[in-house]
């Protein structure tokens, strides 16, 4: 099952790049299948980075696997409350154009929406007329990185927050298999995000 929350009706005539974020361990602390809104804590520098990108005119999208729902560890209602709390913490106006999540688990028969499949990203690109070639993906897991690569995103940023520390070696090995057409940047956390890539979009 896919949850598609669309907050912006701004569909630009010309394709624009987007900043694609994973949620848990990237934007908010990974609390191991978070189900209580009171446990929503922003990762260091996530708010300042998101607001900077928003002010620069970037489309900002969240794409996350939420297998805790299919595992019965939380409900879609819990997910909705967590989403509301997170958006509130990022301040007004809401910087997110769209938030995509799927409940498919690693053992689900249907994994169409589940990362590393790129389909949540491709869906958002269709809805918001996104230029994937010039977009950026930020994730903490190998599955995030693969989803970005398979969707055609050329700039991939891996963080060590969340599961990033334990998956960094695998991510580096993965990066070696891709051509120079792709750019990989491995950072400790969002405070190190190279803002030079977030050029102003008119």
Question: What spans do the regions from the language model cover?
Answer:
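Asp-based, Mg2+/Mn2+-dependent phosphohydrolase catalytic module
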Residues: 15, 77, 81-97, 106-137, ...
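Flexible, glycine- and charge-enriched loops at secondary-structure boundaries
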Residues: 36-43, 75-79, 114
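Active-site neighborhood of HAD-like aspartate-dependent phosphohydrolases
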Residues: 15-61
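Active-site phosphate/pyrophosphate-handling residues
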Residues: 3-6, 41, 48, 119, ...
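Conserved alpha/beta core of the MobA/IspD/sugar-nucleotide pyrophosphorylase nucleotidyltransferase superfamily
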Residues: 1-15
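Residues that scaffold the ATP/ADP-binding catalytic core of kinase and kinase-like folds
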Residues: 8, 30, 72, 196
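Short, small-residue-rich loop/turn micro-motifs
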Residues: 23-27, 103, 160
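Substrate-recognition element of Asp-dependent hydrolases with the DxDx(T/V) motif
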Residues: 46, 50-83, 95-105, 110, ...
